[in-house]
Amino acid sequence: MSKYIKIRNAVKKYGDQTIISNLSLDIKEGEFFTLLGPSGCGKTTLLRMIAGFNSIEGGDFYFGETRINDIDPAKRNIGMVFQNYAIFPNMNVEKNVAFGLKNRKLPKDEIKSKTDEFLKLMKIDEYRDRMPERLSGGQQQRVALARALAITPDVLLMDEPLCNLDAKLRVEMRNVIKQIQNNVGITTVYVTHDQEEAMAVSDRIAVMNHGDIQQIGTPKVLYQRPTNLFVATFIGHTNVLDGKLCIKNNKAYLQLAGGYEVLVDSIKEDELKDQVVKASIRPEELIVKKDNGDGLKAI
């Protein structure tokens, strides 16, 4: 059964260096949740703390109501998919998928039934007798995902699983992963630095930088309503303009270089004050017209 994840005041240190400081996070049951950010932002470190592969210097981690800080990784009932696939080279596809089931000493008929189920679900049934060296990268990733799901984990953790695939195969596999996650309904935590990938597969995304969560939201919210300049420039493409916010008769106006002024009706009430600002304008919001019309003259 899938479980929600709750993290409160997490701290991770390597020696005297603090990587993650006082981080709190809630991931809903059955949600596809992505940790997104540049290299070194702490996203994989946080994932490994959830998995139990990294020590926890502070804070509390929960699967449902169960605190997991001191639970051995093997007993957390997680499925893990790594960026290098980590399938066993000395086992064929069927034995790789069945590995976790055999480790749990399940009855032989149940092992056979669940192995067959996930071979078919991942569309690798025809490769059941094939060795890993005879599989493509995409096929190996399907095997890794089938093996992770076959044990019926409470949580599925995925650490940049598509980074070693070519561009075309990445698009194909991200669609497969999202479809399978929807079908199975398992709580999934996905790590990537690729914002396009994150936007395509996620229910919600946490944008991270320097060990802190900058913003959590749906892909649409992050794109249209970024909470700060980092999120605005990291998600998609944007044009950043310097300006001033001026309040006149309780209305907000954005003043730009050249004396242009625009009425802005989306400013939060607690931000209605004169201040220096940066305006983020997405490319698709710009309209090129032959004749003059409403808006700002760009050229």
Which residues fall in each region the model found?
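Conserved ABC transporter NBD signature motif
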Residues: 59-67
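Glycine/charge-rich catalytic "coupling/switch" loops of P-loop NTPases
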Residues: 224, 253, 257-299
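The feature captures the beta-strand-to-loop junction immediately N-terminal to the Walker
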Residues: 36-38
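Conserved coupling/switch loops of ABC nucleotide-binding domains, chiefly the family-specific signature
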Residues: 57-60, 110, 210, 242
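Helix-to-loop junction immediately C-terminal to a conserved catalytic motif
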Residues: 51
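ABC ATPase nucleotide-binding domains
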Residues: 73-79, 83, 87-230
